[in-house]
Regions:
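Short N-terminal binding/cap micro-motifs at the start of the first secondary-structure element
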Residues: 21, 52-53
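ATP-dependent carboxylate-amine ligase
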Residues: 37-38, 47-50, 57-246
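Compositionally biased, intrinsically disordered low-complexity segments
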Residues: 11-13, 45, 186
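Extended acidic/charged loop-beta regions that coordinate divalent cations
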Residues: 1-39, 83-85, 89
Length: 246
């Protein structure tokens, strides 16, 4: 159900996101909008249960303000998402690159849940750039747990933003990798080989590109300049035409 609104329920079609859309039914009990129970079908062009929840909250809010709920649901269908939120950059040789601004463990967890719904049969690879040394230190284990939902992860050097590395001499990409050693992972054999640290972002992107096979999906994740690495992993068509055939 919706967070903080137990009287509104979402019934999601688990396979729907594979088509690139999220289909669900919004159940509104009698007495909330009128005397009748309402069951409103909704289709979103953006995947993820978190997006379904956000859209449902917006639809209900609009309905409570007097907008016809079916009309509100229809308008929600036109929402194309925000830049750097599950933004598909392109596909070469059946390898797809998706960029996302997620930089907190909760965001990363939601992103990878959506990735599994959208690409249930694909290998999910992640190039993650941590944001802030302090956040990396505080949430290292939570980052590791969230990233464990991917099949293959490379953590790059930390984007410092307002902080200075000299103030955090013991914090690096390895802080997350070390924390991941105790995190269970279905694709690994308990040795943490699903995650590694490569400080140089360009090198990390090239390494991840070399691992790709057809139908793989690569996510560039973080609030820093990691977004530029999509061009490294996914060059202009023809620039590396054998991507995914290695």
């Amino acid at each position: 159900d919706l967070n903080g609104a137990a009287f509104v329920h979402i019934e999601s079609e688990s396979e729907s996101a594979q088509s690139g859309a999220e289909h669900f039914t919004l159940h509104v009990p009698a007495g909330l909008l009128d005397e009748q129970e309402r069951m409103v079908p909704v289709t979103l062009t953006v995947p993820g249960i978190h997006n379904a929840r956000n859209a449902s909250a917006a639809i209900i809010a609009a309905a409570l303000l007097g907008v016809d709920i079916e009309k509100a649901a229809e308008v929600a269908t036109s929402f194309l998402g925000a830049a750097r939120r599950f933004q598909v950059c392109g596909t070469v040789s059946q390898v797809t690159v998706v960029d996302d601004y997620a930089h907190h463990p909760t965001e990363i967890s939601a992103l990878l849940d959506a990735a599994r719904r959208r690409y249930p049969r694909s290998v999910i690879r992640v190039l993650f750039q941590p944001h802030l040394f302090s956040r990396t230190r505080t949430f290292a284990h939570e980052f590791a747990e969230a990233l464990s939902k991917a099949d293959d992860v490379i953590v790059t050097g930390i984007f410092p933003a307002r902080e200075l590395q000299r103030d955090f001499p013991d914090v690096s990409a390895m802080t997350i990798v070390d924390a991941a050693q105790d995190v269970p992972h279905a694709s690994a054999q308990g040795d943490g080989t699903w995650i590694s640290a490569v400080d140089d972002m360009q090198v990390a992107a090239q390494m991840l590109a070399m691992r790709c096979r057809p139908t793989d999906v690569v996510f560039t994740v973080g609030a820093g300049d990691i977004t530029a690495m999509g061009a490294v992993i996914l060059p202009a068509p023809g620039a590396r035409h054998n991507l995914g055939d290695r």
